[in-house]
Amino acid sequence: MTDLQNIEPQALRKLIRDKKVTGHTSGMAKGYIQANVVILPLDYAYDFLKFCFKNPKTCPLLDISEVGEVNFSKYGKDADITTDVGAYRVYENGELIETPTDVKHLFNDQMVSFLIGCSFTFEHALLEAGIPLRHLEEGHNVPMYITNIPAEPAGRFEGNITVSMRPMTMKDAIRATEITTHFKNVHGTPIHIGNPADFGIKDLENPDFGEPVKIKDNEVPVFWGCGVTPQSVALDAKPELIITHAPGHMFITDVKDSELSD
């Protein structure tokens, strides 16, 4: 059986491309950056680029492809963004219409792909520090919630930010904050610790994306900005076509997470 925790990125991308790995990628290719994916028509690319720069906590931009290209010079030279993500979401005019395992049939030479930092990247550092992560212990995707906090609008893109949540003791929450200070390009420090109602989350048992996790009596919910935010703002921007990763199914890059820490 393949050791997916310690596999090289190129090998993991091939398994995903060949549909041999189809689940969420948290904990895979340990030590390498994982990225959220947004693929847009060129006409929307500049507005989305501005949106990322205005919202670095939720949309920390790692790389942009050349127009019509499926790879990235640094983050995945031999990659194919249309096949190397385990599951995609396809929106037309703000409506989710398809969740395919590749998007070759939709890609054309007037599309631009964006890689956005993902909190899965700093999970390795948290685990190395002895901070347990409940979603990994329970074997499923991290829970994500749409908040009532508006993102900074840019052109046609506006909407509320999405956060991911990891429960931990207050002691571990403080340590996690210190550790993620060094990962500014993959969401950085938490945006909130404690009461989810403070920013409009009514029920932690019903995430908007991912699966719920158990929160123990001695734990608090810790929230980080989440790169699923573009999916929620896409519903408002209503481009004729936007393709994203399905939550939890990240693009595995060739760059080590140590290159993003300071």
From Swiss-Prot:
Give the InterPro entries listed for this entry. Answer: D-Glu_cyclase, Putative_hydro-lyase, UPF0317
Name one molecular function that GO assigns to this entry: lyase activity
Q: What class of enzyme is it?
A: lyase
Q: Supply the EC number(s).
A: 4.2.1.-
Keywords assigned:
Lyase
First and last residue of the signal peptide:
none
Q: Which Gene3D superfamilies does the entry mention?
A: PSTPO5379-like, PSTPO5379-like domain
Q: Which family does it belong to?
A: Belongs to the D-glutamate cyclase family.
Protein name, UniProt field: Putative hydro-lyase Sca_2211
**SUPFAM superfamilies (UniProt xref):** PSTPO5379-like
Write down the PANTHER family for this protein, in alphabetical order.
Answer: D-GLUTAMATE CYCLASE, MITOCHONDRIAL
The family database entries (NCBIfam families) matched by this protein are listed as: PRK05463.1
Domain of life assignment:
Bacteria
